[in-house]
């Protein structure tokens, strides 16, 4: 057969067996015929990628499921196994028609990154090779992407059926729902099962996501990137099956890696939002203490002022951290709160240093006035006033802003 410039289904392609008036669309191809080898001249429509680490008990069944899906859809496809096994997984995969590659690095994410660079299909599917995902359910996911209804289609285990013994109760009722909530709030993913491993997406969507994580957090990064870049994600319920072989997942270490990755890539939620909240509470406490008003019989004096000053300083420092993180680390979703946006986009080194210097000088001027009063009073003890706390806060914030502007300037160069 001649090489084709783009992927095509058998019903669209000229067939050698279409004789005696038989049209190409009348020919039904088996899954074995539709699963392409590495040296095939036909461009596959779908590339199915499976990372494997000692999955000899399940790899053959997974490939058979893919063949059944290809036969159901009557499209050409390939199975690419990114293997790091020490058992017979690669031999079994090759015997069943898969293209076996060996990543030159370690990690769940790296296996996918390595494989995605080498697939040939216009559409890419991913899933584990331990029989937990039935690849015969691929058609309903691929159809959503091919029709343009979604950039990425995911199989939802939590909206579908989880067979007994398939998922630990802690994962089903705590871990996965909690991590999904994080991703939905921080990145606007809008999904029910953010860590489902069965996904289908277009090549264009993959290039848009621009993922780079090499560990287990790769699964989170895909959703984070898709949500942050406004890709359309849709789900279909799927059935989750008991796995074949030993599990490679470490619940708490892997779960923490997901949480850590989500937080450090959302400085607005990690730093700016709590910083803004603390600052508002702190300033409110300072105002109440300075004004001397009573609320419900409660008096707000110097102790309230000291607490308000500490909260204001802590909040301002956290908001600076949000600005520094946004500029220095290029997070998936940078902080978009008013302070960070203003500080990173409107404040140059010179302007920030100038504003900080003015605030600093105001605080120092009041401090100088206190010192003068102390000297002229014969070095007698002076009562602590809320205004003293405000002046101290002004000095510290001024210093933070001056040197923070220089740091931000150096990070931005």
Swiss-Prot record:
Pathway: Protein modification; protein glycosylation; Cell surface structure biogenesis; S-layer biogenesis. Its EC number is 2.4.1.-. It holds the Pfam family Glycos_transf_2. It is found in: Membrane. It comes from the Archaea. Keywords: Glycosyltransferase, Membrane, Transferase, Transmembrane, Transmembrane helix. Hexosyltransferase involved in N-glycan biosynthetic pathway that takes place under low-salt conditions (1.75 M instead of 3.4 M). Participates in the formation of the tetrasaccharide present at 'Asn-532' of S-layer glycoprotein Csg, consisting of a sulfated hexose, 2 hexoses and rhamnose. Together with Agl5, mediates the addition of sugars 1 and 2 to dolichol phosphate in the tetrasaccharide. This is Low-salt glycan biosynthesis hexosyltransferase Agl6. It comes from Haloferax volcanii (strain ATCC 29605 / DSM 3757 / JCM 8879 / NBRC 14742 / NCIMB 2012 / VKM B-1768 / DS2) (Halobacterium volcanii).
């Amino acid at each position: 057969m001649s090489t084709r410039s783009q992927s095509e289904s058998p019903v669209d392609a000229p067939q050698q067996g279409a004789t005696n008036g038989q049209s190409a669309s009348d020919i039904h191809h088996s899954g074995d015929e539709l699963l392409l080898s590495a040296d095939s001249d036909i461009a596959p429509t779908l590339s199915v990628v499976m990372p494997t680490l000692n999955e000899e008990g399940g790899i053959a069944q997974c490939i058979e499921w893919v063949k059944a899906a290809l036969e159901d859809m009557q499209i050409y496809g390939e199975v690419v196994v990114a293997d790091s096994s020490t058992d017979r997984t690669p031999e079994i995969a090759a015997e069943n028609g898969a293209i076996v590659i060996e990543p030159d690095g370690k990690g769940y994410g790296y296996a996918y990154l390595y494989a995605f660079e080498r697939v040939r299909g216009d559409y890419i599917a991913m899933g584990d090779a331990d029989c937990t995902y039935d690849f015969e359910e691929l058609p309903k996911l691929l159809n959503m992407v091919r029709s343009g209804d979604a950039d990425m289609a995911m199989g939802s285990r939590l909206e579908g059926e989880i067979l007994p013994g398939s998922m630990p109760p802690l994962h089903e009722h705590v871990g996965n729902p909690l991590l999904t909530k994080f991703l939905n709030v921080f990145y606007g993913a809008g999904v029910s099962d953010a860590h489902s491993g069965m996904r289908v997406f277009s090549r264009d969507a993959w290039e848009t996501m621009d993922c780079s994580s090499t560990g287990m957090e790769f699964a989170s990064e895909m959703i984070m990137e898709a949500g942050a870049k406004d890709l359309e994600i849709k789900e279909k319920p799927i059935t989750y099956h008991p796995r074949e072989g030993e599990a490679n997942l470490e619940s708490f270490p892997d779960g923490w890696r997901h949480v850590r990755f989500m937080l450090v890539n959302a400085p607005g939620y990690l730093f700016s939002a709590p910083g803004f909240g603390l600052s508002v509470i702190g300033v409110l406490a300072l105002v109440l203490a300075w004004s001397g008003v009573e609320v419900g019989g409660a008096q707000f004096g110097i102790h309230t002022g000291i607490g308000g000053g500490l909260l204001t300083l802590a909040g301002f420092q956290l908001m600076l951290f949000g600005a520094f993180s946004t500029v220095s680390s290029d997070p998936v979703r940078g902080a978009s709160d008013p302070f960070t946006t203003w500080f990173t986009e409107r404040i140059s080194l010179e302007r920030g240093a100038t504003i900080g210097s003015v605030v600093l000088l105001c605080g120092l001027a009041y401090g100088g006035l206190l010192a003068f009063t102390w000297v002229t009073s014969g070095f007698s003890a002076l009562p602590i006033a809320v205004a003293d706390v405000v002046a101290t806060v002004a000095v510290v914030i001024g210093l933070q802003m001056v040197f923070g502007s220089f740091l931000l300037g150096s990070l931005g160069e």
